[in-house]
Amino acid sequence: MEKLLVFHLDDNNLKKLKQVTGALKIRVEEVPSSDYLKPLEMIVNKTASPLIQPFSGDVPSESLIVFCDFTEKKMDKLLAALRRDQIAIDYKAVLTPTNKKWNVMRMYLEMQAEKSAYQKTKA
């Protein structure tokens, strides 16, 4: 079943997102900032490790969602609904074999770097 990991989304957009995902039968998991040092696969699988300390630093200001186990059709439907309902999310990513090993902070850094590189090509 599809799961959407949600990071640092404001209450208004989170409420709208939950309405959309509920209609599409997509599970939403809000990830607390204390889990930001966990690898994404641990968050998805709800596993723990005594070696990983809770995150206690500054939380990125941008919102992020990570699509887990989505079919192309379901992802297209959700992306269309996000546009239609004007749900503002700064970064959208798909869980891959590579990035599932990253922690949340690494994902944010990669997303910020991609956005910066994209903006340079548009300029």
Model-derived regions: residue spans:
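Short, Lys/Arg-enriched, disordered terminal segments
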Residues: 1-2, 121-123
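Long, low-complexity, intrinsically disordered polar/charged segments
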Residues: 1-8, 61-65, 112
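N-terminal, charge-rich interaction modules
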Residues: 1-46
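Short, charged/polar micro-motifs that form catalytic or ligand-binding hotspots
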Residues: 7, 64, 68-69, 93-97
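Gly/Ser/Thr-rich loops at beta-strand to alpha-helix junctions
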Residues: 10-13, 36, 71-74, 98-102
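Helix-rich interaction surfaces within compact, conserved domain-sized segments
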Residues: 13-22, 29, 79-121
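Short, intrinsically disordered low-complexity segments
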Residues: 36-66
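Mid-chain, well-packed structural core segment of small domains
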Residues: 55-85
